[in-house]
């Protein structure tokens, strides 16, 4: 195979890896944590991964504390936790 073909194959494999969903064995442990609004009284839209439903759901984040299962966008939640 030519070096150009190898580079193309490597590029396609890299793209495939980036688009492949996270498997449960590769999912960070914090994705299993419940939604936690924290102790502050803000009203911010956030998203968390719900392990039973295996999807990302919206919740209201108070603005401080909480836990790591807290994402600003649903896409960020899906990239990190969704299988």
From Swiss-Prot:
UniProt signal peptide: 1-24
Residue span(s) of domain BPTI/Kunitz inhibitor: 31-81
GO cellular component: extracellular space
Compartments where found: Secreted
A Pfam family annotated for this UniProt entry: Kunitz_BPTI
GO MF terms, alphabetically ordered: serine-type endopeptidase inhibitor activity
Site positions for Reactive bond for trypsin: 41-42
Keywords assigned: Disulfide bond, Protease inhibitor, Secreted, Serine protease inhibitor, Signal
Disulfide bonds: 31-81, 40-64, 56-77
SMART domains: KU
Function: Serine protease inhibitor.
Protein name from the UniProt record: Blackelin-5
Organism placement in taxonomy: Eukaryota, Metazoa, Chordata, Craniata, Vertebrata
């Amino acid at each position: 195979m030519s070096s150009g073909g190898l580079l193309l194959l490597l590029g396609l494999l890299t793209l495939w890896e980036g688009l492949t969903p996270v498997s449960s064995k590769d999912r960070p442990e914090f994705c299993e944590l419940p939604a936690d609004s924290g102790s502050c009284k803000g009203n911010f839209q956030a998203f968390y991964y719900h392990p039973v439903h295996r999807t990302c759901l919206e919740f209201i984040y108070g603005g401080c504390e909480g836990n790591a299962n807290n994402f600003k966008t649903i896409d960020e939640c899906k990239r990190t936790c969704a299988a």
